[in-house]
Amino acid sequence: MRPFHAYSWIFSQQYMGTKNVKEKNPTIYSFDDEEKRNENKSFLKVLCSKRGVLPIIGILYIILNGNLGYNGSSSSGVQFTDRCSRNLYGETLPVNPYADSENPIVVSQVFGLPFEKPTFTLESPPDIDHTNILGFNEKFMTDVNRYRYSNNYEAIPHISEFNPLIVDKVLFDYNEKVDNLGRSGGDIIKKMQTLWDEIMDINKRKYDSLKEKLQKTYSQYKVQYDMPKEAYESKWTQCIKLIDQGGENLEERLNSQFKNWYRQKYLNLEEYRRLTVLNQIAWKALSNQIQYSCRKIMNSDISSFKHINELKSLEHRAAKAAEAEMKKRAQKPKKKKSRRGWLCCGGGDIETVEPQQEEPVQTVQEQQVNEYGDILPSLRASITNSAINYYDTVKDGVYLDHETSDALYTDEDLLFDLEKQKYMDMLDTSEEESVEENEEEHTVDDEHVEEHTADDEHVEEPTVADDEHVEEPTVADEHVEEPTVAEEHVEEPTVAEEHVEEPASDVQQTSEAAPTIEIPDTLYYDILGVGVNADMNEITERYFKLAENYYPYQRSGSTVFHNFRKVNEAYQVLGDIDKKRWYNKYGYDGIKQVNFMNPSIFYLLSSLEKFKDFTGTPQIVTLLRFFFEKRLSMNDLENKSEHLLKFMEQYQKEREAHVSEYLLNILQPCIAGDSKWNVPIITKLEGLKGSRFDIPILESLRWIFKHVAKTHLKKSSKSAKKLQQRTQANKQELANINNNLMSTLKEYLGSSEQMNSITYNFENINSNVDNGNQSKNISDLSYTDQKEILEKIVSYIVDISLYDIENTALNAAEQLLSDNSVDEKTLKKRAQSLKKLSSIMERYAGGKRNDKKSKNFDTKDIVGYIMHGISTINTEMKNQNENVPEHVQHNAEENVEHDAEENVEHDAEENVEHDAEENVEHDAEENVEHDAEENVEENVEEVEENVEENVEENVEENVEEVEENVEENVEENVEENVEENVEENVEENVEENVEENVEEYDEENVEEVEENVEENVEENVEENVEENVEEVEENVEENVEENVEENVEENVEENVEEYDEENVEEHNEEYDE
């Protein structure tokens, strides 16, 4: 057989004939030629035997072959007729033209083929970002090639907006050429390439014309929306980039697919027709996607330009109204002078008095109504279309989640509404003043007797009006006086002024050195005791100082809790850049819609964020703050989970880079050889000591830094294995905890009404009390159920934060020790410095056992305060809503205090036991570890000396002696220290805890507490002693093995060298002899 050559004339003659295709490639459409030959063999012999028959048959064959046959390459062997071929190129597609056909047929994608299903439908287009045009092309080429024998028209997106594929005259003529391919003769192979280039040029010209059409359309945006030139050029440049990238990429993909098909040995004409139609579908799909993407890009932030234009018009109107008002006031002295002359002279020329200019004010009012109703939606309408704050409209069925709305009610929208309200107040005030002045003028005209007094009043009026006009545009008096929560809430924070004002004096002196910012309200600055120019570090430091002072004493009275609550409110506002900007500009009006969290929950999240230099802000803290501050339900959070995950992925990379950079900064002095490099680190850790969950966080950081450093030093296999095992275990546990947390939050915080138990704001105080539906609400549960649920939630949050912290610290440390821009020697120094940092942290961590106990204690402690905050805030809300008299409020406060005392009694035993156990175990462990370390060091030195002399003989004996010495020393020291420490610590801790927490309790309860404490202490001490002994033995064995191995190697090398030298000398002596 000849080798294949796709471009030769011989190939076209050999493989493009119907007869050859029938013989070599029979299909289901061809007849069985052999059977027909056998049946008609005798009949052919009879015909051929007669004269004149053969020439007649030959002529008929030529005629019929020219009219009915075709010169194609179809592997099916079926003649190309309308009955059994595809009609893909008609201008209108029939519903089902082959429904009554008995023969096998090949149809288009409208009817589908067996086992061929589209990857998506028009109702659910592919989830690809509108700026990712290359990703769209890749997805489209996969979908459009879904069918093997037909084309997938459903892959064309956005057909409801930009129309499907329409076959115009140019495409219709081209499809006719493809249908008639081979009928006119010639080289079909070359014709295929020519026609492919032709359809590519047709579609590229259409695509280029689309670019001109879009540019012409969007160039009108500059005039229509007064879009800045820079913004327009930036958006259009992005569109041009998408158009060029998409066109080049699609052309390359289509040409590549055609060339791969064109190089095959057997070319199917039907497959070629499918490829030409695929070309048309592909360019149409890309055109639709480009139009959609450009529309999204050009329409983004279009509301901002509308807002700017609206504010400009409002500002112009306000200035115009003010100018008219000033002219009117300037004309008042002339009017008064003319009235005095008329009154004195008994009448005068009335026509000399100029008419009052009331028309501009009326037109301003009409324009205000028209523009507010027609041009810009109200604040309520904006919130109705919001995609984030739609919790209040979902239940009413008003929310429409459609891409055309683009109605995220952002911070910019809120600022715009506040700014607009300011100008509206200015216009309303100017109109009211003009009306009042007109009324006063009429009363002056009527009251002739009080002429002089009236004149005096009118002379003084303009100055007062000027002052009012100057003050009102900042913030209207109505908005300043009304929203003050209640006189209790505003005045009570001043109780903390004794604690606030004294330390604030130094702070304010430094902050007031800069130019003072003029703000309408400084209440929150006064609560934190900082100046209005204070930076974020100063505000944060001051918040933690005040919060840690008030936190332990919340239950002692309503005043302390109120101070703690106000401190948290102040930091929620001033600690956030956007809220601080609103507060500085608009005062109380700017934060009326801010949703404040339960103070203890906010303190919990802030405490987890306190270690952000080493860990960054944990992801769960960021998500929960967004969750609570926006008052989103769990259903809302699930709807926005994809966008949040994308944001958190990007944030995680920045977070790891920040931690890695911070580690490098604090370790650089150690790398450089500074002996005092650890002083600032110890100061930093001392400042973090005592925070909520400080021990678990430091223990996680210590463990990660230690083993990551070891993986980059000698004997890294064990640490690498431990890291891998811990990472896998964390992933499994994290998945389970995430599911548990989500299910718990969904059950108790699944709706906006359920969120009212832990959030509140100043504008909708009443709505925070009612719970219209029958869903579970934390505030409605019993004390035991509340405690159980909240302990679960807090425990889940802390566990997720710890796993997140470990993962972040691991990645940041790996980045630090895998820097390609640094040599190996420097990387080794970094690893050694990181290991030293973990040793410093170990002093503050306290070990794994203290880690768990401290976490459980902090969890129970903070849950108690959360419950106290929920009950207190709900009581205040109900009292304000029902206008309860003062004596009822007093009784409510007494009830709250009584409940707090009961809670203290309930938790007192746990606190006493916990403190006693911690102190006893801590002292016992310190003494055991200290004595064990001294003994181990002495014994190891003895072991090393003995090993140098006789390695093989003395190793076993020394190890046994070490173990015996360690056990004896440990037992002796532990028994002595434990007895002394138990007696001292138990007596001290029991007396202190009993005096502080159980002064009001009965003597019987105190005795029970003491007995329980002694029993628990004895049990825990015995367990801890055994565990310490086991740990010491393990450490001794590891140290001995390491030292033994090193010494053995050294001794072996020395012995080998001495032995070799002696043998050489003996050999030389023998040789000389």
From Swiss-Prot:
Question: What membrane topology is annotated for this entry?
Answer: Peripheral membrane protein
Predominant location of this chain? Answer: membrane
A Pfam family this chain is assigned to: DnaJ
- Has keyword Cell membrane? yes
User: Which InterPro entries does the record match to this protein?
Assistant: DnaJ_domain (IPR001623), DnaJ_domain_CS (IPR018253), DnaJ_X (IPR026894), EMIR (IPR052423), J_dom_sf (IPR036869), PRESA_N (IPR019111), PRESA_N_sf (IPR044885)
- Taxonomy, superkingdom: Eukaryota
What pairs make up the disulfide bonds? none
> Record's Gene Ontology CC terms?
plasma membrane
Any coiled-coil regions, as ranges? none
Question: Where's the J domain?
Answer: 521-589
Posttranslational modification, per the record? The Tyr residues in the variant tetrameric sequences in the RESA repeat are possibly phosphorylated (by homology with band 3).
Q: Sugar-bearing residues?
A: 71, 639, 773, 777
Keywords from the named record: Cell membrane, Glycoprotein, Malaria, Membrane, Repeat, Signal
| Basic and acidic residues: compositionally biased ranges | 445-456, 476-502, 894-930
Region ranges (Disordered): 428-514, 894-1073
Tell me where in or outside the cell this protein is found: Cell membrane
Q: Where is the composition biased (Acidic residues)?
A: 428-444, 457-470, 931-1073
State whether keyword Cell membrane applies: yes
Q: Which residues form the signal peptide?
A: 1-65
Q: Where is this region: Tandem repeats 1?
A: 436-504
What does this protein do, in the record's words? Answer: May disrupt the normal intermolecular interactions of the cytoplasmic domain of band 3 and thereby facilitate the invagination of the red cell membrane which is necessary for the formation of the parasitophorous vacuole.
Q: What is this protein called?
A: Ring-infected erythrocyte surface antigen
**What is the organism of origin for this protein?**
Plasmodium falciparum (isolate FC27 / Papua New Guinea)
* Originating gene: RESA
